[in-house]
Design a protein with these regions (language model features):
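C-terminal catalytic "cap/lid" subdomain
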Residues: 1-200
């Protein structure tokens, strides 16, 4: 990650145990942590910087080229920056968004498709409301005109759109249970540079 990413000045991702307000105030004072409400209590907030490179990319490429099934970018990976002297790396207290990291990995590997599997069938407009409707076939430009939930669907949409813009290839967001149909173009929200008709 970039040590100058503006996210470091605006911690937003809750991590760790849940505290009462009194406990959160004490921990914040003692450890100089940002704290914020989360559900029924308070949790530590850390930055969520944008991933800019994947140091293990060559190893991942080599493993793929030699027939390995590679599991990478789980949970977004471990955030690191270059040391101030430019030699070596150091860990930073942050959380990398798993969807943006997966998108970056797919772009760097020149993947044929990015599939973001989740627990809903598609990207919905007006999610949770009576007039909710699934987006079936869309483009990054169309999606830019809508607002999605910050902590759930927004990063998935941003990641899928980044992949489509960078590669000109298709991305899909939908249910893990429908992954084969998503790959075939029969399910999920299909995102491509130009809208197309979903295969029947």
């Amino acid at each position: 990650v970039d040590p100058n990413d503006p996210a470091f000045s605006k911690p937003s991702k809750p991590i760790g145990p849940v505290y009462t307000q009194a406990q959160a105030d004490a921990v914040a004072k003692q450890r100089h942590w940002a704290m914020g409400p989360d559900g029924k209590g308070y949790r530590r907030l850390v930055a969520s910087p944008k991933p800019v490179s994947i140091p293990a990319l060559n190893a991942i490429r080599w493993l793929l080229a030699h027939g390995s099934l590679v599991i990478a970018a789980g949970g977004g990976g471990i955030p690191i920056t270059r040391k101030p002297d430019g030699v070596g790396m150091q860990g930073v207290e942050a959380v990398i968004d798993k969807d943006l990291c997966s998108s970056l990995l797919a772009i760097e590997l020149q993947a044929d498709r990015l599939i973001i599997a989740t627990d809903v069938a598609a990207v919905y407009l007006n999610w949770g409301q009576a007039d909710a409707r699934a987006l079936v076939n869309t483009t990054p430009e169309e999606l830019a005109g809508y607002a999605f939930a910050t902590g759930s669907m927004a990063p998935k949409v941003a990641a899928a759109c980044a992949f489509v813009r960078a590669t000109g290839k298709r991305a899909v967001i939908g249910s893990l249970e429908q992954i084969e149909d998503m790959l075939a173009g029969h399910a999920g929200t299909q995102i491509s540079p130009i809208a197309y008709q979903v295969a029947s």
